[in-house]
Amino acid sequence: MAAMAPGGGGSGSGVNPFLSDSDEDDDEVAATEDRRAGLRLGAGVGLDPGSAGSLSPQDPMALGSSARPGLAVEMSAAPAALGGSGETPARLSIDAIAAQLLRDQYLLTALELHTELLESGRELPRLRDYFSNPGNFERQSGTPPGMGAPGIPGASIVGGAGGREPSTTSGGGQLNRAGSISTLDSLDFARYSDDGNRETDERVAVLEFELRKAKETIQALRANLTKAAEHEVPLQERKNYKSSPEIQEPIKPLEKRALNFLVNEFLLKNNYKLTSITFSDENDDQDFELWDDVGLNIPKPPDLLQLYRDFGNHQVTGKDLVDVASGVDEDELEALTPILGNVPPTLDTPLPIENTLLVQKLEDKISLLNNEKWSLMEQIRRLESEMDILKAEHFATPAVGDSVQPSLVWSSQKDSEDNRQSPAVNSSDQEKTKDVHLEIPDAADSFIPKENSSGSFPRKEREELPPSSVSNKTTLHFDQPNRKLSPAFHQALLSFCRMSADSRLGSEVSRIADSEKSVMLMLGRCLPHIVPNVLLAKREELIPLILCTACLHPEPKERDQLLHILFNLIKRPDDEQRQMILTGCVAFARHVGPTRVEAELLPQCWEQINHKYPERRLLVAESCGALAPYLPKEIRSSLVLSMLQQMLMEDKADLVREAVIKSLGIIMGYIDDPDKYQQGFELLLSALGDPSERVVSATHQVFLPAYAAWTTELGNLQSHLIPTLLNKIEKLLREGEHGLDEHKLHMYLSALQSLIPSLFALVLQNAPFSSKAKLHGEVPHIEVTRFPRPMSPLQDVSTIIGSREQLAVLLQLYDYQLEHEGTTGWESLLWVVNQLLPQLIEIVGKINVTSTACVHEFSRFFWRLCRTFGKIFTNTKVKPQFQEILRLSEENIDSSAGNGVLTKATVPIYATGVLTCYIQEEDRKLLVGFLEDVMTLLSLSHAPLDSLKASFVELGANPAYHELLLTVLWYGVVHTSALVRCTAARMFELLVKGVNETLVAQRVVPALITLSSDPEISVRIATIPAFGTIMETVIQRELLERVKMQLASFLEDPQYQDQHSLHTEVIRTFGRVGPNAEPRFRDEFVIPHLHKLALVNNLQIVDSKKLDIATHLFEAYSALSCCFISEDLMVNHFLPGLRCLRTDMEHLSPEHEVILSSMIKECEQKVENKTVQEPPGSMSIAASLVSEDTKTKFLNKMGQLTTSGAMLANVFQRKK
């Protein structure tokens, strides 16, 4: 007899040792153990409820002696009741007697015992707790053990023992509480109290408690009625249904009420009010105002419109079907054959001989098919075992795809053979893969065969089968998407599932046992590792055991609990632990099939979608992708897609969203519902715009290539996806006239760049020669540098095509077609040439050429496009379109041409994105010639040089092009036009910063010195910024001296004395390079010459020139004031120069004069501090701090120069 606490269940009180962060409390566990101990009678003396010495309903004398518990409870008065021995038995505790009475439902006896104990002042907690809980009197109670069954005398005997009979002896009905009976929890003890002040309050509390209990009673009763209504079918309908099983199953009362409610709701929503009133009158037994009238604990379904719309998304089957190998019981055939053979030839049985022969033929065919089936299943098992071994030795994550595909192939082959050869089996659908179904009564029967189960094998046949055949009695089929992805692409996509099979534990997890023998072997392998490692850090050792049990257990509730344990095994699983759990989930899914994966595994994911720990949510996101191949296709494209979309939009953890993106990519590899295309596109845009760089990177590596593959199959790559992205870029450029959103531009353009491999694969697959691409003979070689390095395996063209060998054959035919046969009839390539390229070139012309980031992005895009499509395509299709637009010719040079296409971003993008794709000699010559022509045309037309500068900046970032750029500049140095020479001199400034000092010494400085002696003064002036940049970046003493000498000649040569533009350029250069130049050059050359220029400017009589020089001097002094300046230099040059400048600004710019006065005062204070505190030539720490403070103040105030003079007058005043 099972020991059960009153009102409790027998299986729900156990403590699960596998849960790491369960909600069980230590107090609850202790209480459970106390209850268990209290259920044993005489626990202290070894008595058991089932022993002869226990108090049980079968012992009337014992009950009679215990009917008055107020007396001394001695068992010596009834020796016969204790087995008839003359020995005095042990004394029983009152608590043990009370427990036995409650367990056997002797409630009246127990109540009298409780009353007498209260009267004697010895209240028993067990009885007090039991009778104070009204719930104990409202549940349905069955017949107690040993009671109510015919032939057991205990019932009548106890019934006559003082009238203390259990209420259930008269039937198994409810023990309802009556309103007139006061239970102990509702007794008004205030009536018996001397203190009457609290009587009202206590009565109110008791009444509130009574009301709450009454509501709970009503709710429980209605729940019972709801369940009863679900299963209640009128007798006549049941008879009709049994006699005619082809008729639809009759409607249940609960279903009828639910449908009535939904129909009435639909009528009201659509203004069919009169119809609704009539409908309500015809169903007057139902309240249409409240759903609870239908069923209290039944959730309300969506409205009829939603149900109708959602109907097409689900495949409705009448019965639970599972793909199993069909068989016929040999015993039945043997019993059937003689009966058929003995049928006499009558009119009612025509052609008996033919029927008998037909049956015999069918028997023979079934026997042959069964033999063939078992041999194939044995072969499948052997091959899978070999694959598991190879996978454990050689592969890690990618091995999962390998292990799935062969089994699917064998299953589909075997099924197709069964469909062709066996007329006795039924096909459940007419899709591409026809599955053979055998109907079974319960899901558990498909895993634990029973003798009488219709889905189990006959006893005789099971005994004769080889051991492996039993374990493979079910052939599972997973929904294969109607997709055309190459196996290589599929394999690369599945490689993003985070699973592990390259370790001992990983191989155990991926090799789930599916028979009793295998379970034993698994336990033998795993237990030695589990026993010492039950700590939290090693909980993953339990995964094989949990999975095996969950796979084979017949009870759905237990399986659900085990899978719950699996997902909650580790509180915050790390990366390795998550991989192990995922590997186990995939292995579980492969063994149980898509139906159980959907019903058992997916809910575990859904429960943790909003878990507080990101590691748990990460596990959910990763499991959605890992389980995608094993789910029904309707679930893949609906529930799983919605889960991932919710996590992408709502989850705040970057790692979780990254995993979501990878899982979305895997889903996109399996989805085949065209209606989900737009939803996928919206998810793509959301992922590309994610603020996390990790998420964006995962989008380009996984999601975008997988989505592009699906888009290609739907025919939307060239018709929707790429054009939509291009239109978004154009819209950005139109709206960005006053400020371009460069982040969004980068987002869309990078997406286009990631689509280039998919576009090229589409061009190859739809080429006129695609049917000729057969692998035979020697496969041509593909150069390593033929394609740009892909961001991920999914962007590798060979992966998209299927294999590197197939790609090599296609490339050979592709080049031949372009070179000799042209593009006639090649629609996919003509779209690239006639629509994509012109639109791209038009977009390029709208880009702001001064935006370095935009120029760089488009340059990289064209570079990848040209490298992917090949050299022949670039030379024959891309370059001619650019050249047609640019039209580099000196014949039509005029000033208006400066506003043309040469000044736009088309020039740098063509130079850096197209002409640099290939680096053979002829390609380099073409690039040099193009840059020389652009430099010449821009110079001669007096156009802005921004496009040329952008080209030099982009190319100068790569040292491989430094020599080439110097060649272009030398062409300008020796050009006959002074305008071109002047442009070349200015370009040297851009090139010097990135060129190594050897090239500067050998190529740059000689060219600049040549230009510095040019006959044209404008050319000489144009060299000054380049000389200044050399002073700023070069550290070789010899080079610095040469530059210093050249600059000194500009400043000290009498021929330049009146050259206002030269002085302006020198001062501007000094202000730019002075703070970063070598200190000795700054102290000995820059500051003294600025002092001289300030003195000369005092003598200038032209106010416009004086103001121009003064303004540039002010900017130069402002920049140099932040540098360390020695005391001598401060006194002899810096302060005198500032005073000269202030003299000029007093009349020309009073607002500048205020700031200069403050600067002079600060500098004088620094000099005074040095003189007082430190010997000459040194500087104290305090003075240094004052100097730094002055610099900070000055820089903060410099930003206010553009404000009014009145405000500037107060900028540097002391605070009072």
UniProtKB/Swiss-Prot annotation:
The modification Phosphoserine is found at S20, S22, S54, S56, S180, S182, S186, S385, S453, S792, S1149. Its main location: other. Keywords: Acetylation, Coiled coil, Endosome, Golgi apparatus, Lipid transport, Phosphoprotein, Repeat, Transport. This is RAB11-binding protein RELCH. The lineage of its organism: Eukaryota, Metazoa, Chordata, Craniata, Vertebrata. Residues 255-287 form the LisH domain. HEAT repeats lie at residues 601-639, 640-679, 1004-1042. The gene is Relch. Residues 497-779 are annotated as: Interaction with RAB11A and RAB11B. Residues 142-154 have a biased composition (Low complexity).
